[in-house]
Every structure is written in structure tokens, then in C-alpha cells.
């Protein structure tokens, strides 16, 4: 049977991305930005961004990232924008991002890496899971979610059942109904093995 994939893009407009970026620059001078466009394969990085990142952050070599002017980075609607700062801790950068007053237009979160992830309002993991369930005809009560980062919070709260990993951030621990062993202990596999009585290799 032919497989089908259901994709719905909810893009952040150039105007919104530009407004947020410039407000954040006012609040945290020196912030560097990257935008992810098209199907997620196109990265537009500001000059100086690559020096702040590693392969693990985006699954690509920093040396392969372009060094663009900010106007070029912000040119065109994007799936997501990433912001990072050479000196400020991520908690401080997040606090300054929250102070710019655009919560009605953007969603700002973190994933455990030293960078902010900014998307259009309503673009969260729970909205993606909800779309997938609608497409597949799966009831929300039949879903189970696992997470460890701040960007998992909405999904953990939305799912019919949810587990935060033992190494999760406090927000994720508070949002989940249960705890799972840590990522290092293969916590997801341990939980999944229990009801089905089999080993996940």
C-alpha cells in the first residue's frame, strides 16, 4: 500500500520575524539569528551565527552555513527562526525575548540547547500531534507522549497520557502525568516494553 504523508505548513511571515528579531536585538544586542525555510532543508544564518553552534544543534556542519546579513536571513516566510547569544545564558535570553511583547504572534521555546526556537503562534508539538491524529483517525485519549524539554510541555499536557524523562526540565516534569527513566537509561523503551511484554531493540 502506498504511504502518504500529511504536511501542513504554518509559516511565520517575513514581517513578524523581522519585527521580533529587531525587538530582541534591542533587548539583547549581539543576538545572532538563523531561519529555516522551504521544507526545512534551507538554512539562512546570520554572519557570526555559525561560530556559536555545533553539528549537534542542527545536524549540519557550521562551516557549511552561510554568513548572511540579517536582512537576508529574514527575507521570506520561514518555518522557524533560531536565536542565540554569544554571552547571555539561555535563561536570560529567553527572559528578554519574553519582554518584547509579541506573544500573540510568535511562540518562543527551548529544546535544551543554548538557543531559542521561534515559530508562528500555535506551532507547537501538540498542534502537530493533533493534526496527525486527525489525519489518522486516532483519538486523543489513545496517545502517549514522551518529552524532556521546554518545547515538549504543550504536547505532554495535550496527550491522553504522558511521561517526562527523569532528566527533563522542571516545566516538562510538571506537565507530564508520569515519570520515565532518563534518556541515558533508554527510558522510552522501558516504558513501552511494560504493556506489550517485549524488548525494544
What are these regions (language model features)?
Residues 23, 27-146, 150:
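Conserved acidic, metal-coordinating active-site core of Asp-based
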Residues 8-9, 40:
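Detector for glycine-centered tight turns/loop "hinges" at secondary-structure junctions
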Residues 117-201:
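Mg2+-dependent phosphoryl-transfer enzymes with acidic/Ser/Thr/Gly-rich catalytic loops
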Residues 10-18, 22:
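Active-site-adjacent loop/tail segments of enzyme domains
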Residues 13, 66-68, 179-182:
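Short acidic-hydrophobic, aromatic-tinged amphipathic segments that line or gate anion-handling sites
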Residues 2-7:
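Short, small-residue-biased leader/transition segments that mark boundaries at the very start
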Amino acid at each position: 500500500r502506498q504511504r502518504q504523508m500529511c504536511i501542513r505548513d504554518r509559516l511565520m511571515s517575513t514581517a513578524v520575524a523581522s519585527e521580533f528579531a529587531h525587538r530582541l536585538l534591542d533587548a539583547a544586542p549581539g543576538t545572532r539569528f538563523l531561519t529555516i525555510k522551504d521544507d526545512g532543508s534551507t538554512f539562512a544564518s546570520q554572519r557570526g551565527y555559525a561560530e556559536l553552534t555545533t553539528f549537534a544543534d542542527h545536524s549540519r556542519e557550521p562551516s557549511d552555513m552561510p554568513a548572511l546579513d540579517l536582512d537576508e536571513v529574514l527575507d521570506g516566510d520561514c518555518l522557524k527562526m533560531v536565536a542565540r547569544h554569544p554571552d547571555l545564558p539561555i535563561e536570560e535570553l529567553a527572559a528578554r525575548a519574553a519582554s518584547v511583547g509579541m506573544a500573540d504572534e510568535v511562540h518562543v521555546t527551548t529544546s535544551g540547547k543554548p538557543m531559542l526556537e521561534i515559530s508562528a503562534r500555535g506551532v507547537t508539538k501538540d498542534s502537530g500531534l493533533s493534526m496527525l491524529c486527525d489525519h489518522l483517525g486516532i483519538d486523543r485519549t489513545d496517545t502517549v507522549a514522551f518529552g524532556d524539554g521546554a518545547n515538549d510541555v504543550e504536547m505532554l499536557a495535550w496527550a491522553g497520557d504522558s511521561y517526562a524523562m527523569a532528566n527533563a526540565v522542571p516545566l516538562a516534569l510538571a506537565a507530564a502525568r508520569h515519570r520515565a527513566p532518563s534518556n541515558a537509561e533508554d527510558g522510552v523503551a522501558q516504558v513501552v516494553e511494560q504493556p506489550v511484554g517485549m524488548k525494544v531493540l
